[in-house]
Amino acid sequence: MSALQTMTEDLALQMLAQNGVAVIWRLNLAAAEAHRTGHPQSAAALIDLADAAEDAWLRAQGERRLS
């Protein structure tokens, strides 16, 4: 795993802890706005962050079911 992936996952976990699962939707909305206003690299970074948050949330849901 690259340093950028690790940093993205860490930030996603912090955002989930502070803002709950709704942060995934907000990140996707922000990515759409960034893309629409001509900032494709920012949009891609926000999508990566949203994906990392969603993956972490889904892993947590799976762990709860197994407990």
Predicted stretch roles:
Residues 20-21, 43, 49:
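A generic structural signal for ordered secondary structure
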Residues 1-33, 56-61, 65:
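N-terminal acidic leader/helix
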Residues 32-44:
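Charged, low-complexity interaction regions
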Residues 42, 64-67:
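Short glycine-rich, low-complexity/disordered patches
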Residues 5-6, 47-51:
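Residue-level recognition of hydrophobic positions within alpha-helical transmembrane segments
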